Every structure is written in structure tokens, then in C-alpha cells.
């Protein structure tokens, strides 16, 4: 046929059987990728330390999505929470991966069958005998089935009525586990961080989809609307489908980047805004203050801070710190976290407690500045020592650790104090193993960053695709050069210029 590469899909334009075939093959590819990727991730995933080396630090992409839907156990005998399991059942990580691969194979065979047996009676208009599809009816069928699936997910899977529930955690990502969720029917259901909204919205949207599907199955579109929106043209279906997909992609890019109940930080890592707002830092200080109010010592109060909470308060876990084109997991960047060294408290020779000003998200380097509780600069690591007034040496800064591995240890020599001041810029201080993975020390983004970038980018591309195909189908007659008011029958090839009788071709 000699089609250019960007027009090859025209071969299925008026061929419903093979149009179905290529869509089944596409489903096979998607499902096969998901299953294969899951098996690859399971082969390289280390479940031994869910606190300091969780899935998002290791660059896992599909494991978090399985986990948030209720999969927590492996046939390898481990659980995502760090324990061991003896009977993981069929729906383990490997079981889900295998099911996707089996489904992919079945779709592959179905695609071949429909490619070979493309000329089925069901695709033919009984009045004309030519291939045609009743697109409004097909729309109603799909809407009804999607509504049933949506309702079923919300009413059964999420609520635990028939299913495991979903991953639910506290606001600080410490106590996450899979549990049943009751629908939230009040105003709180519209809070993106309330898990109950997931159940209620799926039930409501599913009900609406079922009713809308039944409506479109039982009511035919008016003729003027049918013609005006080109409902008989398959490219209209393509255009509106692309619109649905790019809209969904924009929405999930937002819920992933800004955070929501559907993207728990235990599975995808913290958001950049939690670093920007000092979210975990404030919670840590609140817990320490509560401990001091209970007459605990500073050391005891800091020792009660969960290592998991301290680890969230580290800039290396900020998804906006990794460049878009720095390939690899977070562990390949700053290394595998081994342990929390403790919280450093800096003091000058007059006994004032000093606080290191933290590095903002979009800085690669930042001056080391120590301020007192009133925000007055008291010490720094100067760029030019000849002009310094607040250097660690001049001010006599010391550091003492509370909690963690260095609990109770203090340093007064300036070189060590400056080392820990620099590291305190990056949040809580952790010992990082860079040797095991030959980590290069350059921060990487988490799966939260990759997912957002990918979906925002493709949403933009698909937006243009929607405009393109929508314009093609709405203005098809204009682009083809056919006057819609032309009464005479126009036969392509009769005239050199379509519809212009003065350019009639000579018969051969």
C-alpha cells in the first residue's frame, strides 16, 4: 500500500475485526510488561530492611502499586512489613505477576485469532452487508461494564467485603498496613488524604457509570447530535478516548506529586512539599517536646523517635532532588542507609543552642549557617576565612548527639563540628553505605518523581493528540476538499480537482 509510518493505522480504519485484534494485542503487551516487570523487580528487591531500605529507595515501580491494592506477601517467604510468612496464598507478588503473564498469553492468542478471522457476521450491517459498528451502542456497553468494575472495586475490594482492602497509613507514614476501608459519605470523603473517599467515590462513580451505560444502550442519539459530533466515525471514538486518558493522566500526576491517600509515602516515598514545609521536622520536635514535658532527658526523648520518622526527614528522600535524567534508584545515588547517627545539637561557647539552616529543595550547594532560636546568625562556615566573624573556630561551636548510634557523644574540634554542620543541612544524619552499589553520591529521584514526570509528559502529548484527531473528525469534509452543500454525486477520480466539473478527466 506504500503508507508512510505515521499513517499505518489506516489499515484497520474500516476493518472492525482487525481493529479489535490490534487492541487485544495492545492489552497483551501492557499486561505482559506489567507481569515481566514485576518478576524483574522481585528478583532484585531486598525486603530485609523495610525501614531504612524500603521499596521506593530501591527504585521499585510496580511493587508499590500491587502493595497499595492489598498484596503484601511473597512466595519467597517474606512480607513487605519485614516479617516472614509460611502460607502466602495464590495472590502473592509472584502470583499476581504470573496471572498477568498468563493473561497476556491468552490475549496474544485471541489477537491472532481475530486477525485471521476478521470477517465475522457480527461486524456486518445486516441491511447493507458491509462492515460497520454501532458506536453509540458499543459506548453504552463499555460504560456499563466499566461502571460494574468501578462499583465492584469500591463496594467489595476496598471495603474488604470481598477482598483484602487497601494500604492505609497514618499522616507520617509509620503504621501502614492493608486493611478494609469504610466508605466516607460526608464532606470528609472529598479530602484527598481520607482513604474512605476512595471507596465512596468508586461506589458513586460506578453507580453513575452503570446508569449512564444503560441509558446509552436504551436511548439513541438525536440525528443532529449524531451528525454534529460525527458519532458514526471511528476517529471520534479515538479522539474522545484520548481525552479520557490524558485527563486521567493529569489527575494522577497531581495526586502522585502532591500526595494523597492513593499514593502512601511508605510505598512511593515522601513528597517534596513535606521537606519544604518541615513536615516531619515539626512532628519530631513535637514528640521530643512531649517527652521533655514527661520529665524525660533530652537523650531519652530523642531515643524514642522512630528511625523511620527520622529517615523521612532527610533531603535525600525528597523526590525533587534527583535530576530527571539521573537514571537509577535512590540507593544508587547517596547509598543504602545503614543507621541513624542521632540528632546533632550545636551550641556556642555561651551555651546558646544553634540550628543549622536547612538546604532548600532546588539548591545543590548552600552556605552553612547556624542561627539561634530567634533566627539571629551566630555561626557559619565562611567562604573567605580572612573576613570571617562567625566561624566555628571563632564562636567555639560544639556538637552533641541525642538518640541514634552516637547518642551521648559530643565533639568540640572544629573540623568534626563543621562536618556534622554540613550534614545537618540535609536533615537528620544517617550513615550511608555507598560501596555496595558503587553509589556516586548524586541524589536520585524516587518512583514518585518518575511517575509524575512520565504521566505529565504523556498527558501533554495526548492532549495534542486529542486536539488533532478531534479536529480531523469534526472537519473531515473541509480537509478532504468536499463542499458539504454539494448536491451532485461526487466520484473520486472523475475530476482532477474534487467536485470541480471543469477539470473532468478524459476516459482512458
UniProtKB/Swiss-Prot annotation:
Q: Quote the InterPro entries the UniProt record gives.
A: PS_antenna-like (IPR000932), PS_II_antenna-like_sf (IPR036001), PSII_PsbB (IPR017486)
Superkingdom of the source? Eukaryota
**Localization of this protein:** Plastid, Chloroplast thylakoid membrane
What membrane topology term does the record carry?
Multi-pass membrane protein
Q: Which Gene3D superfamilies does the record cross-reference, listed alphabetically?
A: Photosystem II CP47 reaction center protein
Comment on bound cofactor: Binds multiple chlorophylls. PSII binds additional chlorophylls, carotenoids and specific lipids.
Q: Which GO terms describe its biological process?
A: photosynthetic electron transport in photosystem II
Is Plastid tagged as a keyword? yes
Q: What is its main location?
A: plastid
The cellular component terms of Gene Ontology attached to this UniProt record, alphabetical and capped at eight, are:
chloroplast thylakoid membrane; photosystem II
Transmembrane keyword on record: yes
| Keywords (A to Z) from UniProt | Chlorophyll, Chloroplast, Chromophore, Membrane, Photosynthesis, Photosystem II, Plastid, Thylakoid, Transmembrane, Transmembrane helix
GO molecular function, a single term? chlorophyll binding
- HAMAP family referenced in this protein's UniProt entry, alphabetically: PSII_PsbB_CP47
Self-association and partners: PSII is composed of 1 copy each of membrane proteins PsbA, PsbB, PsbC, PsbD, PsbE, PsbF, PsbH, PsbI, PsbJ, PsbK, PsbL, PsbM, PsbT, PsbX, PsbY, PsbZ, Psb30/Ycf12, at least 3 peripheral proteins of the oxygen-evolving complex and a large number of cofactors. It forms dimeric complexes.
Q: Which family does it belong to?
A: Belongs to the PsbB/PsbC family. PsbB subfamily.
Name assigned to this protein: Photosystem II CP47 reaction center protein
Organism (species): Sorghum bicolor (Sorghum)
Native organism taxonomy:
Eukaryota, Viridiplantae, Streptophyta, Embryophyta, Tracheophyta
